[in-house]
Amino acid sequence: MILTEEQYKALLPFEAEFRYAKTSQCCILPHVKFLKALEIIYGKNWNTKISPSIPTCGYCKLKMMVEIYDSMERFKNNSGN
């Protein structure tokens, strides 16, 4: 996924939790915050844009968090920050 600058900035408060998910393969982000992150990326109707519509399985959630973190890293590296 490719993030806009606005999305990247909105996701910064979650960066440590996303990094932890990637390095430890463990998800510590509360579900409410995870849903907020999905809304930042996909918009208000995020549940119609991803499958499954609500990733409740730990592995699916972890996989998405790692993908989001990787996208944040790519944005940071491409913007020179």
Predicted regions located by residue number:
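Alpha-helix initiation/capping motif
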Residues: 4, 27-31, 81
